[in-house]
């Protein structure tokens, strides 16, 4: 939440640059990546980091979310984000469709035959 930044210079920079993220989301990482695609949702500021770390801010809800995938993989990020959004009651049809397009949970072999699935099996705990 920009209004909680106590440093005036940093707060001013955030006010100027956050809208640019939504205007040019591909600059976050490049085309076709979660970090770029999710920032099309004007209510979200999100960025992945090293070793499977991901951070998300929901502006209107004033919620910050972060998680880390122990083995560092990024492939499951869309599944995890979608489940987090489901559990907290956040829904944007375009964002949901994009998350499913990146990973729908179905594992396929080289012949595109489904051979398994990945499911999220966690329940969020509130810490505030």
Question: Language-model features: where?
Answer:
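Structured C-terminal helix/loop/strand segments within mature extracytoplasmic catalytic/sensor domains
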Residues: 3-128
């Amino acid at each position: 939440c920009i209004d909680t930044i106590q440093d005036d210079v940093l707060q001013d920079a955030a006010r100027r640059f956050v809208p640019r993220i939504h205007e040019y989301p591909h600059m976050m990482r490049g085309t076709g990546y979660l970090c770029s695609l999710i920032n099309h949702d004007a209510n979200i500021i999100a960025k992945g980091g090293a070793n499977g770390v991901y951070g998300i801010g929901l502006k209107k809800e004033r919620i910050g979310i972060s998680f880390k995938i122990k083995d560092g993989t990024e492939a499951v990020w869309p599944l995890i984000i979608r489940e987090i959004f489901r559990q907290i009651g956040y829904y944007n049809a375009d964002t949901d469709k994009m998350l499913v397009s990146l990973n729908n949970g179905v594992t396929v072999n080289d012949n595109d035959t489904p051979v398994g699935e990945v499911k999220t099996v966690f329940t969020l705990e509130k810490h505030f």
